[in-house]
């Protein structure tokens, strides 16, 4: 396919138009008085959001060169989201400011490589200063403040703080859609996995449509059970003990399932069968987790064990098991604390080594289930559109809170970026390097300026006053007052601010050193189909 190539000034100008289009759509959402953006969806209702990365990912421009510029800035938002989980709008605003300011200087004759060095020096100094002024997060109230600022909702802040108090800082907190209008916190005690009963005839409570087993034995295997003879020896031993039985297997089907159901209905014994959770290697790991939690063994041919040789000693035990149509919850497993702790340590080690985001998520889930108790924030809203928007905000707030726990907090509302201004301005440099430092200084003002503009105020006035204020004092755009940001609970995670600045500078430096841009030439439109209107059908009468 033929290519279009643009060079130097023309190339950068084309890409800048794309940068501005995307950044202008994203930056209207910044701050407590930021607006929303409506995104069209091919199916279902449109999505209304103020989440920077969600907006950035949706934007696709017709002009190939402009689109490349837009995609570069979308990359800033996406990378910041991956690392810190929030701060995507701030990152976009910083990137746009650095690119615009840098481009003016390149046009005026500055050397892009010199500018790049200056930008890198300035950002390194700013990040060092951010580390110095950040404060460790302490107590439930600080966590609630960080979450409330990110979600723009105090109630959500309290829910997240409560959830984190229960599971610790690196515990798993899941989000689910509620069937009601309210958002609430629900804690699932014990280990829960998403597999329900193999047959509805196994339920013990017909009102709640669930099976409840008290002090059951638990048979754990990765085999498919289709012949009752395979498990008959262990079944007889369990019946003699007079205890219910939970069977976790790859599948229970055919004659085996029919026999279990018939005996359950006759009252011969109380048994519930469920499929094993997960797939492949993850299934094996989860079965091993359940075995360790309940003090049982996984009966698998890999270890030379078969079902016929299983005894009650190889079965797990738990205080209670609740099985619904969709979930199984094992409460009060009797596994040894030492073995559970060792397993948790093993999963933590895997977490540190993994590079896959999906694997990390699954390992964290396993960790939380073993530790016992998974908080679920059930998000409620009046409409589906509002529900999607709330869910995105709460997701951001969760990520933001975790980031705050990792690297501490700094003054929010763009104030911390202005607090490092003096440190960056004091760097000694000459020529284009000094110009690069000035580009970063100009960009550091931009988030505060944009927050003030979104609140209907004159941005430059707020920026100039902030330069003369003490560290930590800033402008509360929600009330229009000048306050101590940390004391007022207007805080940002240091990790979010750091990531936004680093990623914005990285893309801006790449942009300014671009000298040629190559894109596919648009394909000519296919010729229209000829008009068929004149073709009569009279000559086809003989075919009737």
UniProtKB/Swiss-Prot annotation:
- Database matches in InterPro entries: Chaperonin_Cpn60_CS, Cpn60/GroEL, Cpn60/GroEL/TCP-1, GroEL-like_apical_dom_sf, GROEL-like_equatorial_sf, TCP-1-like_intermed_sf
The catalytic activity of this protein is classed by the Enzyme Commission as: 5.6.1.7
Disulfide cross-links: none
Keyword Isomerase assigned: yes
Could you confirm whether the keyword Isomerase appears in this record?
Answer: yes
What top-level class of enzyme does the UniProt entry assign? isomerase
GO cellular component terms, alphabetically, are: GroEL-GroES complex
In this chain, ATP is annotated as bound at: 29-32, 86-90, 413, 476-478, 492
A Gene Ontology biological process noted in the UniProt record is: protein refolding
Query: Per its UniProt record, what Gene3D superfamilies does this chain match?
Result: GroEL (3.50.7.10), GroEL-like equatorial domain (1.10.560.10), TCP-1-like chaperonin intermediate domain (3.30.260.10)
Indicate where this protein resides in the cell.
Cytoplasm
Pfam families xref list: Cpn60_TCP1 (PF00118)
Give one GO term, molecular function aspect: ATP-dependent protein folding chaperone
Write out the entry's keywords from A to Z.
Answer: ATP-binding, Chaperone, Cytoplasm, Isomerase, Nucleotide-binding
User: What reaction does this catalyse?
Assistant: ATP + H2O + a folded polypeptide = ADP + phosphate + an unfolded polypeptide
Main localization is cytoplasm
- Protein family per UniProt: Belongs to the chaperonin (HSP60) family.
Q: What is this protein called?
A: Chaperonin GroEL
Q: Which organism is it from?
A: Bacillus cereus (strain ATCC 14579 / DSM 31 / CCUG 7414 / JCM 2152 / NBRC 15305 / NCIMB 9373 / NCTC 2599 / NRRL B-3711)
């Amino acid at each position: 396919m033929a290519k279009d190539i643009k060079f130097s000034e023309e190339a950068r100008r084309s890409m800048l138009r794309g940068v501005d289009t995307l950044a202008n759509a994203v930056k209207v959402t910044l701050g407590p008085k930021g607006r929303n953006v409506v995104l069209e969806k091919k199916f279902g209702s449109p999505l209304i959001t103020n989440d920077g990365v969600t907006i950035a990912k949706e934007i696709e421009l017709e002009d190939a060169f402009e689109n490349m510029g837009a995609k570069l800035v979308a990359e800033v938002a996406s990378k910041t989201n991956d690392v810190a989980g929030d701060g995507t709008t701030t990152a976009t605003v910083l990137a746009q400011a650095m690119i615009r300011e840098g481009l003016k200087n390149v046009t005026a004759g500055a050397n892009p490589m010199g500018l790049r060095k200056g930008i890198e020096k300035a950002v390194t100094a700013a990040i060092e200063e951010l580390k110095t002024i950040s404060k460790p997060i302490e107590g439930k109230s600080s966590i609630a403040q960080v979450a409330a600022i990110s979600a723009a909702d105090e109630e959500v802040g309290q829910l997240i703080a409560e959830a984190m108090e229960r599971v610790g800082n690196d515990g798993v907190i899941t989000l689910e859609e509620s069937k009601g209008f309210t958002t609430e916190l629900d804690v699932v005690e014990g280990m829960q996995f998403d597999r329900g009963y193999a047959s509805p005839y196994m339920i013990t409570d017909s009102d709640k449509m669930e099976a409840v087993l008290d002090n059951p034995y638990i048979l754990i295997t990765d085999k498919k059970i289709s012949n009752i003879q395979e498990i008959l020896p262990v079944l007889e031993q369990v019946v003699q003990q007079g205890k219910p039985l939970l069977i976790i297997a790859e599948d229970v089907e055919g004659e085996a399932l029919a026999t279990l159901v018939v005996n359950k209905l006759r009252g011969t014994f109380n048994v519930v069968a469920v499929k094993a959770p997960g797939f492949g290697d993850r299934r094996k790991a989860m079965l091993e987790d359940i075995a360790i939690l309940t003090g049982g063994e996984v009966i698998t041919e890999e270890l030379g064990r078969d079902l016929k040789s299983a005894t009650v000693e190889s079965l797990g035990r738990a205080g209670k098991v609740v099985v619904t149509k969709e979930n199984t919850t094992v409460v009060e497993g009797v596994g040894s604390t030492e073995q559970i702790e060792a397993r948790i340590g093993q999963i933590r080690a895997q977490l540190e080594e993994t590079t896959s985001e999906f694997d990390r998520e699954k390992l964290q889930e396993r960790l939380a289930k073993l530790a016992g108790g998974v908080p679920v924030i059930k998000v409620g809203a009046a409409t589906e559109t509002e529900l999607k928007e709330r869910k995105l905000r709460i997701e951001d707030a969760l990520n933001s809170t975790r980031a705050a726990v990792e690297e501490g907090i700094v003054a929010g509302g763009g104030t911390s970026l202005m607090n490092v201004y003096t440190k960056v301005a004091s760097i000694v440099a000459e020529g284009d390097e000094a110009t690069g430092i000035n580009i970063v200084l100009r960009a550091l003002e931009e988030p505060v300026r944009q927050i003030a503009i979104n609140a209907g105020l004159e941005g430059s006035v707020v920026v100039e006053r902030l330069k003369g204020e003490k560290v930590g004092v800033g402008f509360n755009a929600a009330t229009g007052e000048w306050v101590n940001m940390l004391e007022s609970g207007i805080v940002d995670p240091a990790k979010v601010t750091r990531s936004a600045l680093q990623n914005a500078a990285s893309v801006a430096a790449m942009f300014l050193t671009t000298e040629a841009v190559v894109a596919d030439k648009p394909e000519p439109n296919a010729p229209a189909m000829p008009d068929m209107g004149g073709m009569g059908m009279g000559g086809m009468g003989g075919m009737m």
